[in-house]
Every structure is written in C-alpha cells, then in structure tokens.
Amino acid sequence: MCLVRRDIFNARPEVDKCSTRHSVYKETIMILDALENADAYNALNSGFAKAFEFLRRDDLAELEEGRHDIDGERVYAMIVKAAGRETEVGELEAHEQYIDVQYVISGTDEMGWRPRSSCTQPQAEYNDEDDYQMFSDRPTAWVATEPGTFAIFFPNDPHIPLISAEQLHKAVVKVAVE
C-alpha cells in the first residue's frame, strides 16, 4: 500500500500551506509498504537506498538497541525494543531535518498520522537542535504496521509511533532531508 502523491517530483510549493522548509517534500504524505517494494521509493531521497539496504540485513533482529551509523549523520538507524503504549498516551511528533523510515521487526505498531497543515495545537516551537515538534492534536488516521512493513514519515507527517498492546521491536532509520 502506498500513500504518496505521484506529483512529488514536480512539487508546487505555492499550492501547499504546510510550514516545512523543504519544498520537495511538501506534497508528499506518509508511505506504508512492504520491504520487498522499498526500492520503488529510492528516487525520493538519495539516502533511501542505504536505509533499505540496512533494513534488509540478515542480522537486523539481533542488533543491539541504540544507534547504528549507516552513512554518518546523513543516514543512521535506531534499534528500539519497547512496550507499546495506548493511543491516549502518544503525542504527535514531526521532524524537519530528517525523514523517519520506521520498520517493524516484531509486534504490530498502530502508528497515528495527521497532516501537518491541519495541526493547530503545537506544544512548543520547533526544536531545531533535537529536530522535533510535538503537537497535542489527535491523529486523523491509524495505520497498523506489521513485521516486514515500513512507514515513511516526511516533514509534513506528524506521527505517533509505538502504539500497541504488545512489545515492539523496530528499526527507525533517520534519513537527512535533501
């Protein structure tokens, strides 16, 4: 399943009312797909090929929790093992410097999503140093992301990860915005 606008290569920033500063991503929305289809998205960012190569590692499930460098600060992964949270606990987060490629190794992550253009309840200004902004708005969609599938969240995609009734094991690859 792909949820991406096909005209992103000819982005028209004048049409979009979103606040992100990277116009090429202003007309995208989150992507959900199986890892076997990942190469179809490599043209969206030159770091995606390295991100997907990392996610295809035979030893991915055995990697230790924490940061794993792939291409320095440009592409790196965080391996996460965490108990899932309830939907009421999560808050929308958005990033501007990095795109999240969230891959589920085990468990089912019921990630929430809402377009940034409809977020009206920022908790604070964007934190440039840590690359995040939190919103109190509630998601407009929930997406069940199962093992072997990934979700890509662009700067326009506030999202709530780690929503599950079970233990989750994930790889979150951070890909620098171009």
Task: Name each model-derived stretch.
Residues 78-95, 105-119:
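Conserved short histidine dyad/triad with adjacent acidic residue
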Residues 97-109, 115-117, 125-131, 174:
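Short, conserved beta-strand element in jelly-roll/cupin
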Residues 6-29:
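Short, Lys/Arg-enriched N-terminal segments with co-localized hydrophobic residues
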